[in-house]
Amino acid sequence: MIIHHQFDPVLISIGPLAVRWYALSYILGFILFTFLGRRRIAQGLSVFTKESLDDFLTWGILGVILGGRLGYVLFYKFSDYLAHPLDIFKVWEGGMSFHGGFLGVVIAIWLFSRKHGIGFLKLMDTVAPLVPLGLASGRIGNFINGELWGRITDINAFWAMGFPQAHYEDAEAAAHNPLWAEWLQQYGMLPRHPSQLYQFALEGICLFAVVWLFSKKPRPTGQTAALFLGGYGVFRFIAEFARQPDDYLGLLTLGLSMGQWLSVPMIVLGIVGFVRFGMKKQH
């Protein structure tokens, strides 16, 4: 079993200011978005100009942060934040939702398209290939922080990883399983899937490869965005089987996690959109 290193979440401290790994992962994601966006502009495969890309980045950042935070509040801990509404603003304590961030970016794209007279679906197609590497960067941030770890796996599995940060969850799980209790006593922690790395590979690298390569050729308007939508939903749904469900939610109907249920509409809409848009002429 590999033991997680327990990195210090703060990379650099300068007086009262602290640069955190997780914040750095977001910054890297935005840098990658800009780099890929400019490459697509140079290839003539974008509705952006260099100036409008920089302008959109501001809109996108707001969509990610506001949507991600509100999504976490609404989808995962609504009752807690309803009782303590001021805690919503304590973003330094963590708590972001991809699905909320996705909706926030969609709203930003819609507003930006109206302001600049760009077709909404064409803008969605342009943005979609630029996003997955940013998601990959975010999952590396999760891994460095030792958060969002996976479910318990076999002690002899080559991928098994112990997360010291999960000591409370390990003890709680061991109390209901004699074998896990034995492992915990012997090794001091339980073997878990490094699900952050699975999500890095699936939602980040694999999704990027699929959407980027698909969008290198002219496609019917909306089809690239639909591929991203459905592709993310499928990869997230699969990865959730290895990810530990949120302790305050657990597994929901049909034994699925909240992340899986939020991905189901993405899969359905992605498939329907991909087929319907594919019936139209290429843009």
Swiss-Prot record:
InterPro entries per record: Lgt (IPR001640)
Transmembrane segments: 17-37, 56-76, 92-112, 222-242, 255-275
Positions bound to a 1,2-diacyl-sn-glycero-3-phospho-(1'-sn-glycerol): 139
GO molecular function: phosphatidylglycerol-prolipoprotein diacylglyceryl transferase activity
Location within or outside the cell: Cell inner membrane
GO biological process, one term: lipoprotein biosynthetic process
Gene Ontology CC: one annotated term: plasma membrane
Keyword Protease: no
Keywords, ordered alphabetically: Cell inner membrane, Cell membrane, Membrane, Transferase, Transmembrane, Transmembrane helix
Membrane topology: Multi-pass membrane protein
Pfam families: LGT
Pathway entry: Protein modification; lipoprotein biosynthesis (diacylglyceryl transfer)
EC number: 2.5.1.145
Domain of life: Bacteria
Major place of residence: membrane
Family: Belongs to the Lgt family.
General function of this protein: Catalyzes the transfer of the diacylglyceryl group from phosphatidylglycerol to the sulfhydryl group of the N-terminal cysteine of a prolipoprotein, the first step in the formation of mature lipoproteins.
Protein name (database record): Phosphatidylglycerol--prolipoprotein diacylglyceryl transferase
Taxonomic source organism: Neisseria gonorrhoeae (strain ATCC 700825 / FA 1090)
